[in-house]
Regions:
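Membrane-helix boundary connector in multi-pass membrane proteins
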Residues: 94-99, 115-130
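N-terminal signal-anchor transmembrane alpha helix
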Residues: 2-24
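Membrane-interface loop-to-helix entry segments
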Residues: 43-55, 99-110
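Membrane interfacial helix-start motif at the N-side
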Residues: 34-52, 93-94
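Hydrophobic alpha-helical segments of small multi-pass membrane proteins
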Residues: 77-90, 104-117, 132-139
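Cytosolic, membrane-interface loops and tails of multi-pass inner-membrane proteins
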Residues: 25-42, 149-162
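Core segments of transmembrane alpha-helices
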Residues: 50-63, 84-86, 109-113
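Terminal transmembrane helical module of multi-pass membrane proteins
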Residues: 124-162
Length: 162
């Protein structure tokens, strides 16, 4: 029981560290001035969605960690950690460095890692895999948003230099 609780706390801590980059690199006047599609979610949707998604991710990782040791479990956890890094990098690239195109590359990699993670998770815990699906869907939306913002703001003068 204590081991399970510690594993859950560690999982929440890892997700919290990832989330902290989103808290550190947030939308500012640069972002507000960018041209965005009409279907951009309202600002309030982002912290609500990410709060829920990060909790689901932490529970999924905890379920994996508590599963019997196997090659699938090890691979699942490795890909999970990789996608956490890609997730954290996106906020830094997009909001911190204002590099829309590079952030777009990162989010493509992130979505690929999430899809791989879901496939691997399903070999260990069906529940853990399903807990990652909303995250994958939200990141797919974020990818489309990132790509559209890049398209709307690129041109003779790079939007990343505004």
């Amino acid at each position: 029981m204590l081991g399970s609780l510690l594993a859950l706390l560690l999982s929440i801590l890892l997700v919290g560290l990832t989330a902290s980059t989103g808290a550190r690199f947030r939308p500012d006047s640069w972002y507000r001035e960018l041209r965005k599609p009409t279907w951009t979610p309202p600002d309030i949707a982002f912290p609500i969605a990410w709060g829920i998604l990060y909790l689901l991710m932490a529970i999924a990782a905890w379920r994996l960690y508590m599963a019997d040791d196997s090659a699938w479990r090890t691979a699942s956890l490795a890909v999970y950690v990789l996608q956490l890094f890609a997730n954290a990098a996106w906020s830094w690239l997009f909001f911190g460095r204002k590099q829309i195109a590079i952030a777009l590359i990162d989010i493509v990699v992130l979505l690929g890692l999430i899809i791989i993670a879901i496939a691997l998770f399903s070999q260990v815990s069906t529940l853990a895999a399903w807990l990652m699906v909303p995250y994958g869907l939200w990141v797919a939306l974020a990818l489309a948003l990132n790509a559209t913002i890049w398209r709307l703001n690129s041109g003779p003068k790079e939007a990343t230099r505004r």
